[in-house]
């Protein structure tokens, strides 16, 4: 836990920097907004992704808000969430290798886990390990709907793999998943964006329909990221949405996906040098703030000509000379991309009304296996 625990209740200006902050009021409004769209309006399940959240305390907040479970990117993350009491977990990735598969099968005794597959080699390894352990593992087939990354091709290939899973005594075919966001990043025209999402998700739901026509039970049809969820959630055939990063909001989602959530995640820094009237140097660089796919955005300064991040410094050049902020003043940055920022820190500091209210350990940090 952070050494700043003694600062709870104090103004954030007294915190040592750099420090990762979440505005709790903005966070709670983002959560309520996503819950309303996904659960309230669309009537589907919400399984927020924790690849960017990384924090079990946040996961429990989302479960309390109505989420049915969580999505994890890696087995390590799933183990962290299960150890923290999260019970319904989808690992939206392929788990390969005998030691990892053995860990996965052991995890089934602690949580209701499902894992993605996109090939027969994975199916055979999972089935063998589950049977040897006397377990039964839920499996979802990942379908390539837009990303051209992992995923079996839609329709007939997806049905064939689903049948293979269903025929394994150590496995239970649970459904299908896909990610449509890769095909819509940067699309500005809302009609074009909707069409691209409908096409991608249609590949997933069509595959699910064909599985059912083949006599398979399909409980899960999972998709939807922060950049698409308000459209994907309302498309026929979708059963659950994986969007998670929207609870924080950031410059990337706003600029590249048109997500107008509040930017709740910020990095508080200290101005450590003013070498010229137009240059501001702060004590946080790319070891504290992600620089891709978007740079962080400084708050409360004049027009910025440029921003550069080195390992431990942020250097701003202003368009016009300005004596403020001065050395020792605090300067806050909106996270450029929350998924690439949270894992840089050990703790997340929840603030309300300018004061530190809570500190949450980012227990998923470094969990990449």
Residue ranges and their predicted role:
Residues 2-7, 26-58, 71-73:
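N-terminal glycine-rich anion-binding loops that anchor highly charged ligand groups
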Residues 275-369:
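C-terminal accessory subdomain/extension
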């Amino acid at each position: 836990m952070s050494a700043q625990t003694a600062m709870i209740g104090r103004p954030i200006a007294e915190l040592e920097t750099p420090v990762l902050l979440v505005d709790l009021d903005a966070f709670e409004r983002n959560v309520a907004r996503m819950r309303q769209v996904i659960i309230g309006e669309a009537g589907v399940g919400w399984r927020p992704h924790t690849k960017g959240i990384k924090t079990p305390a946040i996961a429990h907040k989302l479960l309390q808000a109505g989420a049915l479970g969580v999505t994890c990117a890696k087995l390590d993350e799933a183990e962290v969430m299960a150890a923290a009491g999260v019970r319904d977990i989808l690992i939206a990735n392929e788990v390969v290798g005998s030691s990892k598969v053995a860990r996965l099968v052991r995890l089934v005794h602690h949580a209701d886990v499902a894992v993605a597959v996109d090939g027969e080699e994975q199916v055979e390894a999972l089935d063998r390990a589950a049977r040897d352990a006397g377990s039964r593992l839920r499996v979802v087939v990942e379908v390539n709907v837009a990303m051209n990354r992992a995923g079996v091709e839609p329709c007939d290939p997806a049905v064939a793999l689903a049948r293979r899973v269903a025929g394994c005594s150590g496995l239970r075919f649970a459904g299908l998943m896909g990610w449509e966001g890769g095909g819509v990043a940067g699309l500005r025209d809302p009609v074009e964006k909707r069409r691209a999402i409908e096409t991608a998700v249609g590949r997933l739901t069509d595959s699910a329909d064909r599985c059912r026509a083949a006599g398979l039970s399909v409980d899960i049809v999972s998709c939807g990221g922060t950049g698409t969820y308000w459209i994907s959630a309302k498309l026929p055939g979708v059963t659950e949405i994986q969007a998670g990063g929207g609870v924080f909001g950031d410059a990337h989602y706003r600029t590249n996906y048109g997500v107008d959530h509040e930017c709740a995640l910020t990095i508080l820094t200290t101005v450590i040098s003013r070498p010229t009237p137009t240059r501001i140097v702060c004590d946080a660089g790319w070891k504290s703030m992600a620089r891709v796919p978007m740079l962080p955005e400084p708050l409360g300064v004049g027009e910025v000509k440029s921003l550069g991040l080195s390992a431990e410094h942020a250097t701003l050049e202003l368009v016009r000379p300005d004596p403020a902020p001065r050395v020792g003043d605090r300067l806050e940055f909106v996270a450029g991309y929350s998924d690439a920022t949270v894992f840089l820190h050990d703790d997340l500091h929840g603030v309300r009304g300018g004061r530190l209210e809570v500190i949450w350990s980012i227990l998923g940090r470094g969990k990449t296996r």
